[in-house]
Swiss-Prot record:
Signal peptide location: none
Role description: Functions as an E3 ubiquitin ligase.
Keywords: Transferase, Ubl conjugation pathway
Protein name per the record: U-box domain-containing protein 25
GO biological process: defense response to other organism; protein ubiquitination
Chemical reaction(s) catalysed: S-ubiquitinyl-[E2 ubiquitin-conjugating enzyme]-L-cysteine + [acceptor protein]-L-lysine = [E2 ubiquitin-conjugating enzyme]-L-cysteine + N(6)-ubiquitinyl-[acceptor protein]-L-lysine
Gene Ontology molecular-function annotations: ubiquitin protein ligase activity
Length: 421
């Protein structure tokens, strides 16, 4: 085989042995398989997992052992070559973090859950949890590996049995919310236990902002993953839980993660119809509108608007949002500005408000909503959004010029019922 092959897109020749035989790309994390052939880790892992391939791609010999051994020598040579060719636009490949070893994961979980024994202490258990968190931060693969070793059950036990140790609570909670959900009902042991729900609620007021955010994240995970309506209601049937979550959104120094987790959790809690009045009493309408007018990104804006629409489906919600001076202008401005989903939720909230009181119909018309709605009907937004626009146009017919010329067309023939999203 030739020592060098034709360049890809760098304008220079890449040494043949620096390229992965599968992807033909410069290797970022070279590993050697049992046949002695070296590949880029991502490529050989994909080769083995897709189609259940059990042969070496180059030699066609059976892969009797799937252990991947890092080729540090080759990786250093590639890094040196990258540095030597920096003037040609080649960036040095980073030194990859090695994936977690199953044996190490088992040992660390055992150490973290140990209660008695030689050298067992809160400090040693917390250190084990921190190492596991480090593995979890590195990659999705590590998170899946940790979860596969019954980590969720172990961490739940630590979290709710070691309540006197703030260090163990914060570390176990932080790791728990990083792991993937492997079973639909794996958090039922939390949602079905009022004491555990109450403890999580108390953590929303912890002195550590990280613990508060992680507590909110776990509440969102538990609420979303709970199928029983009664258990969902038991989680959100508390003004304290709403106050704690809303405080994450209210805090002027909230981090981007705090805002994202806060709105996700608020939406999950407000999905329970029977407890939406608690969110309204806790001040959700004012905080949502203030945040929407300030610093949500697109995804968070969509979720916040969906929450606004949910709360506007109650009379007290309409009243609270309607009294905020920015609500109607902000909702009108959002239409066709952010995304199709945001447009749909904004239109749904406006529909609820305009159905409730004439003064909000007048305010919406004054803010230019009729033109926005006419554009919505002709746009490529969702059918649900168009139906909401059509209903709003019916309600606002007195604000239309020449209403009778097209009010009865097929485009606007629909009922006035709020369409669920």
């Amino acid at each position: 085989m030739p020592r060098n092959i034709e360049p890809l897109d760098l304008g220079i020749q890449i040494p043949y042995h620096f390229r992965c035989p599968i992807s033909l790309e410069l290797m970022q994390d070279p590993v050697t398989v049992c046949t002695g052939q070296t590949y880029d880790r991502a490529s050989i892992e994909s080769w083995v997992s897709i189609g259940n391939n059990t042969t070496c791609p180059v030699t066609r010999a059976p892969l009797s052992d799937f252990t991947l051994i890092p080729n540090h020598t080759l990786r250093r040579l590639i890094q040196e070559w990258c540095v030597a060719n920096r003037s040609n636009g080649v960036e040095r490949i980073p030194t990859p973090k090695q994936p977690a070893d199953p044996t190490s994961v088992r040992a660390l979980l055992s150490q973290a859950s140990a209660i008695t024994g030689t050298h067992v202490s809160v400090r040693s258990r917390a250190a084990a949890l921190r190492r596991l968190r480090g593995f979890a931060r590195d990659s999705d693969k590590n998170r899946v590996l940790i979860a596969a070793h019954n980590a969720t059950e172990i961490l739940i036990k630590i979290l709710f049995s070691e309540t006197t140790s703030s260090e163990l609570v914060s570390e176990s909670l932080a790791l728990l919310v990083m792991l993937p959900i492997t079973e639909p009902n794996q958090f039922v042991s939390i949602s079905s236990d009022p004491g555990r729900v109450e403890f999580l609620t108390r953590l929303l007021f912890d002195s550590s902002i990280e613990t508060r955010v992680n507590a909110a994240a776990l509440i969102e995970i538990v609420s979303t993953g709970t199928k029983s309506a009664d258990l969902k209601g038991s989680i959100s049937n508390s003004e304290s839980v709403f106050e704690g979550v809303l405080d994450l959104l209210r805090n002027p120094i909230s981090s981007r993660r705090a805002l994202k987790i806060g709105i996700k959790t608020l939406f999950a809690l407000c999905s329970v119809k029977s407890t939406r009045h608690i969110a309204i009493t806790a001040g959700a309408p004012e905080i949502l509108i203030d945040r929407l007018a300030a610093d949500f990104d697109r995804c968070d804006t969509e979720r916040a608007l969906a929450t606004v629409e949910l709360l506007c489906r109650t009379p007290e919600g309409c009243a609270a949002f309607g009294e905020h001076a920015l609500t109607v202008p902000l909702l009108v401005k959002t239409i066709l500005r952010v995304s199709d989903r945001a447009t749909e939720y904004a239109a749904g909230a406006l529909l609820a408000l305009c159905t409730a009181e004439e003064r909000w119909r007048e305010e919406a018309a004054g803010a230019g909503v009729v033109v926005q709605l006419l554009l919505m009907v002709q746009s490529e937004c969702t059918e649900r959004a168009k139906k909401k626009a059509q209903k709003l146009l019916k309600l606002l017919r007195d604000s239309w010029p020449d209403y009778n010329s097209f009010a009865n067309s097929d485009d606007f023939g629909c009922s006035s019922q709020v369409v669920p999203f």
